[in-house]
Swiss-Prot record:
It comes from the Bacteria. One of its GO terms (cellular component) is cytosolic large ribosomal subunit. This is Large ribosomal subunit protein bL25. Transmembrane segments: none annotated. The gene is rplY.
């Protein structure tokens, strides 16, 4: 099975009792909503969803095959999580049209330890998400920004975010994502000498 593909079946029996029985048999109850507001009650294998769940973000696109036929492009819209069993007990999917661009907030993930921090500079965080527009299949789950080379006084803005050409950034390009404040100790450091 594709790593982002789920197989579901329409639920014939609805209600709390049917959902509880289904969970005992390893089936996860769910509902798929489309852009017209139409809802389809369905169920899928709990283990298949659990396998994907930890890596999902709000912008992760999944392929949902329904009744062995039509495949829908979906996002996880909402879910119910059981704190005792640490399992998802219900999922709401939102189906979108693959040919229509979507606006979506994408999480920013910073990686690396800024060089300037070793010399006393302070890391200041700004945006944690950016807004983009793209066809559903081109949307990234998250955006990784390497900040390991930052020195005191350096700033990374939205315009510095690496994104494919198929993704249009809607956020202010000058908005700050991360900055390193200057410090007295960095002024005489090698990192301080490189930054202007």
């Amino acid at each position: 099975m594709d790593e982002r593909r789920l197989k579901g079946k329409r639920r014939v029996q609805l209600g709390k009792y049917a959902a509880v029985r289904g969970r005992k048999e390893g089936r996860l109850p769910a509902v798929m909503y489309d852009h017209r507001g139409v809802s389809v009650p369905l169920e899928l294998a709990q283990q298949d969803f659990d396998r994907l769940f930890r890596a999902l973000t709000r912008s992760t696109v999944l392929s949902l095959e329904l009744d062995g036929g039509e495949v829908f492009c979906v996002f996880v819209k909402d879910y119910q999580h059981n704190m005792v069993s640490d399992r998802v007990e219900h999922v709401d999917f939102y189906a979108v049209e693959e040919s229509v661009p979507l606006r979506m907030r994408i999480r920013l993930q910073l990686c690396g330890s800024p060089e300037g921090v070793r010399y006393g500079a302070r890391l200041e965080k700004g945006l944690s998400y950016i807004e983009v527009e793209s066809l559903p299949r081109n949307l990234p789950d998250r955006v990784v920004l390497d900040i390991s080379g930052l020195g005191a006084g350096d700033v990374r803005r939205v315009r510095d975010v690496p994104l494919p050409a198929s993704v249009v950034v809607l956020s202010d390009p000058d908005a700050v994502i991360v900055a390193l404040s200057s410090s007295a100790s960095e002024a005489g450091s090698p990192a301080g000498a490189r930054t202007g």
